Amino acid sequence: MTQKITVSIRHLPHGEGLPLPEYQTAHAAGLDLIAAVPQDAPLTLQPGRYVLVPTGLTIALPENYEAQVRPRSGLAAKHGVTVLNAPGTIDADYRGEIGVLLINHGTEPFAIRRGERIAQMVIAPVSRAQFVAVEALPESGRGAGGFGSTGR
């Protein structure tokens, strides 16, 4: 069963009039984030460049939750545009504007217009680790193999 939590959200002045994040299907994990750039001034993201796109939103997550900002697969597949620091983490105590750091890996400039869906946000529970220093770690079947050691 899906757990429902309450997240407080506020539009900043430049985000007024834009829809709040919403799930596009009944079983979607991510809510769409929308660009809050001026109507008459879209951002043009040149190939190989990145830009911080405003969403015009601030949120207050419950304690022990985070929001992950992830790419939209359609933008990546069609235009080579993705979230540079994916997943970006929004901590429960952050109260600033949600920004989406997009990069254009494509070969053509990409225009980011007001109201365009630019990323998705997944709300997830947080576990906090307590580290214990030890002299040696227990053995495992994998050992120290990394960077492709379990396959091709």
Curated annotation (Swiss-Prot):
Record field: catalytic activity: dUTP + H2O = dUMP + diphosphate + H(+)
Whether Magnesium counts among this entry's keywords is yes
Keyword Metal-binding present in the record's keywords: the answer is yes
Q: Name one GO biological process term.
A: dUMP biosynthetic process
Q: Where does substrate bind?
A: 72-74, 85, 89-91
The record's Gene3D superfamilies line, in alphabetical order, gives:
2.70.40.10
The UniProt keywords, alphabetically, are:
Hydrolase, Magnesium, Metal-binding, Nucleotide metabolism
One Gene Ontology term of the molecular function aspect: magnesium ion binding
- Which pathway, per its entry? Pyrimidine metabolism; dUMP biosynthesis; dUMP from dCTP (dUTP route): step 2/2
Entry's EC annotation: 3.6.1.23
CDD domains membership: trimeric_dUTPase
Query: Cofactors per UniProt?
Result: Mg(2+)
NCBIfam families, sorted: dut, PRK00601.1
Functional note: This enzyme is involved in nucleotide metabolism: it produces dUMP, the immediate precursor of thymidine nucleotides and it decreases the intracellular concentration of dUTP so that uracil cannot be incorporated into DNA.
PANTHER family registered for this protein in UniProt: DEOXYURIDINE 5'-TRIPHOSPHATE NUCLEOTIDOHYDROLASE (PTHR11241:SF0)
Similarity remark? Belongs to the dUTPase family.
Q: What's the protein called, per UniProt? A: Deoxyuridine 5'-triphosphate nucleotidohydrolase
Write down the species. Answer: Rhodopseudomonas palustris (strain TIE-1)
